From Swiss-Prot:
PROSITE patterns: DC, PROTEIN_KINASE_ATP, PROTEIN_KINASE_DOM, PROTEIN_KINASE_ST. This is Serine/threonine-protein kinase DCLK1. The active site is at 527 (proton acceptor). Belongs to the protein kinase superfamily. CAMK Ser/Thr protein kinase family. CaMK subfamily. Signal peptide: none annotated. It catalyses: L-seryl-[protein] + ATP = O-phospho-L-seryl-[protein] + ADP + H(+); L-threonyl-[protein] + ATP = O-phospho-L-threonyl-[protein] + ADP + H(+). Residues 57-143, 186-269 form the Doublecortin domain. Residues 288-393, 711-756 are annotated as: Disordered. Probable kinase that may be involved in a calcium-signaling pathway controlling neuronal migration in the developing brain. May also participate in functions of the mature nervous system. InterPro entries: Doublecortin_dom, Doublecortin_dom_sf, Kinase-like_dom_sf, Prot_kinase_dom, Protein_kinase_ATP_BS, Ser/Thr_kinase_AS. Keywords: ATP-binding, Developmental protein, Differentiation, Kinase, Neurogenesis, Nucleotide-binding, Phosphoprotein, Repeat, Serine/threonine-protein kinase, Transferase. The modification Phosphotyrosine is found at residue 536.
Amino acid sequence: MSFGRDMELEHFDERDKAQRYSRGSRVNGLPSPTHSAHCSFYRTRTLQTLSSEKKAKKVRFYRNGDRYFKGIVYAISPDRFRSFEALLADLTRTLSDNVNLPQGVRTIYTIDGLKKISSLDQLVEGESYVCGSIEPFKKLEYTKNVNPNWSVNVKTTSASRAVSSLATAKGGPSEVRENKDFIRPKLVTIIRSGVKPRKAVRILLNKKTAHSFEQVLTDITDAIKLDSGVVKRLYTLDGKQVMCLQDFFGDDDIFIACGPEKFRYQDDFLLDESECRVVKSTSYTKIASASRRGTTKSPGPSRRSKSPASTSSVNGTPGSQLSTPRSGKSPSPSPTSPGSLRKQRISQHGGSSTSLSSTKVCSSMDENDGPGEGDELGRRHSLQRGWRREESEEGFQIPATITERYKVGRTIGDGNFAVVKECIERSTAREYALKIIKKSKCRGKEHMIQNEVSILRRVKHPNIVLLIEEMDVPTELYLVMELVKGGDLFDAITSTSKYTERDASGMLYNLASAIKYLHSLNIVHRDIKPENLLVYEHQDGSKSLKLGDFGLATIVDGPLYTVCGTPTYVAPEIIAETGYGLKVDIWAAGVITYILLCGFPPFRGSGDDQEVLFDQILMGQVDFPSPYWDNVSDSAKELINMMLLVNVDQRFSAVQVLEHPWVNDDGLPENEHQLSVAGKIKKHFNTGPKPSSTAAGVSVIATTALDKERQVFRRRRNQDVRSRYKAQPAPPELNSESEDYSPSSSETVRSPNSPF
């Protein structure tokens, strides 16, 4: 008993023990329960226990083998995660994509990989862990990729300690200042969402006006005055949400302010002609001079004003009037300014401080307006950084190894992360497309681009858009791509005068040949749809399809769990999240075949409610309604049914599709009845007129893996999803292979009796 009391009193001061023993004692020598040390400790221990139970443990998680991922901080508490499995599920939603952890998070390792975590109790406050799937632990210096500023509250006991521990107390002002090294004087344009023409204001951000993300949001609310009240969200013109203060100081300088209301990309993020003119008038010379005013020591109330005050003083006009006077001065930051200190870092990002988004939305006006002060400013920037302006208007130098072999022409496509230029091989006069990916736009996600390019390197097939050549430099990645000029699949159908089952059969023959080749390499495309099927016109007048856009493609070495793709063409096993493989491409091809023969998809939702569509896909009930299918052969319907089987094992493989009579011409009807599907395709799909026949091919090339992040969607699982998914009957007479490992065909794959 005495030993227990000594243990209990360890946390008390030794000099108070004697007083506590003698004070309030009774005749029997026992201390009074009211004043005893035991009673005091009992109350303290209870409060500490309750506090520790409620307190969240802050830990950092990395992705196994991902040397570019800086980790994500999680607050682990019993209220948030009731079980270890719940934590794994949440980590899967956060960390899994089509490249990293495609099978989901199934294992958590300690940072050294020596131990596997199996319960929440094993997670230690402030430590770091590595999330993996079924692959072995990959030993990397994960903590070397982490910015030490990932927590303001870190207190290290020694400089050599690899992993910092987190403290619960808030850091002091000095720590906060250290974490604002990214702040530099910058003038941003804020456009309010809503009916056009929209109000816009310019706000100066610097270390005096940008104290925190919440404070900047408050200042923007005061300046922009949304009809719906408080500004809840900010987006770049690319649709990326601004999540923290540092996002204001990236490459973007135009932001859309939104309240709690819903928004549509085509309505809110696309600027009309008047808004382009207004944005273009935002001279970067003005920004530079405003930056100098923000950094120099000058008396007056402007140094103490908040962002809205800075807005009016900097602009000199009301917020809705964005035109500024032209100035011939070019920005030249002082040797001690943040701009000069970061000159080397800016050059690694691609150089000019001009926003890619603002350049993109005003490109059509720039072609007609002639050279202006902004062009002269960009030319000075390019000369300062050693770029050859005459070779590239976007501000990057094309490597000599490419210009020696190819004549690079005008820009024909502009995506979120890539630019596409005309490219003609000098020796053969053959026309290609030069895809230029700016690495500054992909910072932190380079692995996604690398995955796409690595797959393009491996594939070489007459029904696949080819990668001809690549060149990797520190600031850009150059890809010489095959340019397909015949439009996409929908263009071919809607523009033809006569369209029959034989044409549809030839199209499926081309598509199945490409899928067969990919599956023989264990590559799954995951985004097969008409927009990614381009029409190639041969010299003899015949046509064939080429499959492009490998942004979601990946190697299959086990079940995949990432829910991604285009909803109309997504397979049921993807939605059910039970694990999927190569045959999701066959399902998509089956949906396309159905559309080719009637003009509308087999599974249709109601409005924007994707759950209705997903439920139909999970059921897998394929109907052939009259009169749309009255003139279609039974052989075609049979093939579609076999391609759209919910049971993956019974679903056709690519080899079986190619061997089917309807595809190899044996099952085609003798009387070629013309199919009237063009009007239905125009009604059910967005197939508006394109500016040129090459627009579809350029659009496919301009797309990158980073654009596909929007196609990774999440669906709340219903309790009966798996039961419905597994309950579908399968024809017992078929015993097809579960995967397609057939060798690839080396000859040009074209249906012998069809233009395709």
